[in-house]
Amino acid sequence: MSETTATEPAVQDQMPAYSEAVKSGLYAKKSGLVGKYDNVRRYWEDEISRAFLYPHLRRLLDRCESEMRRLRILDLGCGSADGFELLTGIRDRDANLHDVEVDLLTNEHLGFYRGVDLNQDLLEQASSLYGGNPKISFQKADFTNGLPLNGKEKAYDLYFTSYGTFSHHNEDETLVRLLAEIAERTEDYSLIVCDWLGRYSYEWQTLWTNDLSENRNMDYVVSYIYDAEEREQHRDELQHLTLRLMSRREAESVVARAAKAAGREIKALGFFDRSIFTGRHMDTAEYNPHAQPIRYGVNSLHEPNLRTDPGSLIIDYVPQKGFAFLNDYFEYLQMCWNSLIHYTVGLLDCYCEADEEYLTPVPEPPASYPAVLQDMMKRMKKVVSGVGWLTTGLPRENVIEPQLGYALRRLMRTLQKGQGCAHGLVGIFEVESA
């Protein structure tokens, strides 16, 4: 055995370099199967929100540019800058393929962003990420006590919330007052994005009620951050939040009251439901014993090198007595969802990789199916046949399954009705001076 020379350090002497890399967290093998920023959050919830926000933010930016000024944003309940990242992650759909900068809201367009939150730890995390930008500021304040602005502060163009923030208004009166303040402070034009927990999410079917004066607030337990075994081990340590459940009908009532109080119109531009069968508490079944871990299944579709069991994606909706309209709606969604999965499994079963063709003719989707379902089925047929030539790199796991995930996402995005039938209900409003 040769001896180590002065110019050839012993292997063990080099190990601290790896230890330092591990401590930095940069060597961590991050999974999108669980956690706050799982695959559903990144590829479904964030992107669905961005898709609905895009046309409104596009028009707002055009308006600011025509007035020779830049956009001012007030993010209420900013957390660790999640809202800022959601907005700056919106892509400009008019960008050319050769463009490198495709963000809609760039630093060039941003005049000022202020994030407001009551949690100091989240604010410190946000500041560590973006505090170096002089056009970004974070402030500790409770927006349920009113708009956290001083009398002389310039009005904002966009008043933004995300991921159920407005459900912290346990009493509608505080939200009415806040929205009225925004309307009163609007000098020319403002856009308001309101984000609540949906009243009729399948996740908390046991809380459904036909009397909107009941079950207005829920005891929301933050148990989804753990897997099933850890969840029970930490049961006594779990955080509980009191959060308002909101339907579209209730949201419209609150906004109408705020408009009346302000003496100005607050016009609804649209509502959308986010995460119909993929809300976080589908996997915990905390509020619905019939809930299935569909979110985990969808996370698996988008996880690299991981093969998903199609059976884990099949929904078996259990109706709730006394809610015929909701039962019909969820039954319809379930049938569309399951049909797309079964169709894709059939494609995989009859496709021959060696011959790069289907062994048997693939039937066309029935004309009675909704247009979006027919479209997604046809696209999945192209996906399966289009990657048949890939004999390495796990084409099913890394190409076909993610595309099925996106097809299911398009299905839910198209068939949602913005009524509060999902984990999140988002309303977009505008205030315009006469």
Summary of predicted features, one role per range:
Residues 149-159:
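A short acidic, Gly/Pro-enriched loop at the edge of an enzyme's catalytic core
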Residues 277-434:
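C-terminal lobe and adjacent flexible extensions of AdoMet/dcAdoMet transferase-like proteins
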Residues 20-65:
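Class I SAM-dependent methyltransferase Rossmann-like catalytic core
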Residues 239-262:
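Short alpha-helix
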Residues 80-146:
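Class I SAM-dependent methyltransferase SAM/SAH-binding core
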Residues 168-181:
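A short, conserved alpha-helix within the catalytic core of class I
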